[in-house]
Design a protein with these regions (language model features):
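Internal, active-site/partner-interface "lid" segment
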Residues: 117-134
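Ribosome large-subunit tunnel/peptidyl-transferase-proximal elements
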Residues: 1-103, 109-113, 131-142
Length: 142
C-alpha cells in the first residue's frame, strides 16, 4: 500500500464554522490554525497548502482568561521615533474583536509564505451572522 501525497490540484477544501461565544480565545484560535493548516485531515501533507476555510462567529463574545483584558496590549510601531502605539486588549475587544481574533490565529500559524495564504482563508465575524451561507459550511463540534 502506497502513501498518497496531496498536490495543489487534488486538494478539496471544506468550509467550517467555529463559534467563539464563551470559549477561550486561545483555544478557538489554536483550533482555527489547525484547520487552516490542514493538520486535522487524514491526508495532511506538510509541504502542500491543504487546509480548509474557517469562519469564526461571535468573536466579540470570546473570553480572555486571567487578567489579560487589563494587562495585555496590542502594540504597533510606525517606524518613526516615538511612533509606538499601544492599545489595551479590553478596548481592542470592544472596538475590533475581529482584529484581536485574527492576531491570535496569526500567532499560531507558521511564520512563512504558506501561512499568508492560509490566513486569507480565515473569515471572522463579531456577531452570529455570516455572509457565507452559499458555501454550505459545516459546524465544527468535535
Amino acid at each position: 500500500m502506497s502513501t498518497t501525497m496531496l498536490t495543489k490540484e487534488t486538494v478539496e477544501r471544506k468550509w467550517y464554522i467555529l463559534d467563539a461565544a464563551g470559549k477561550p480565545m486561545g483555544k478557538t484560535a489554536a483550533l482555527a490554525a489547525d484547520l487552516l493548516r490542514g493538520k486535522l485531515r487524514p491526508d495532511y501533507t506538510p509541504h502542500v497548502d491543504c487546509g480548509d476555510y474557517v469562519i469564526i462567529i461571535n468573536a466579540k463574545d470570546a473570553v480572555l482568561t486571567g487578567k489579560k483584558l487589563e494587562q495585555k496590549y496590542y502594540r504597533t510601531h510606525s517606524g518613526y521615533p516615538g511612533g509606538l502605539k499601544e492599545t489595551q486588549y479590553k478596548i481592542l475587544m470592544q472596538k475590533k474583536p475581529e482584529l484581536a481574533m485574527r492576531l491570535a490565529v496569526r500567532g499560531m500559524l507558521q511564520k512563512n509564505t504558506i501561512a499568508q495564504w492560509q490566513l486569507k482563508r480565515l473569515r471572522i465575524f463579531a456577531g452570529a451572522e455570516h455572509t457565507h451561507a452559499a458555501q454550505k459550511p459545516e459546524v465544527w463540534d468535535r
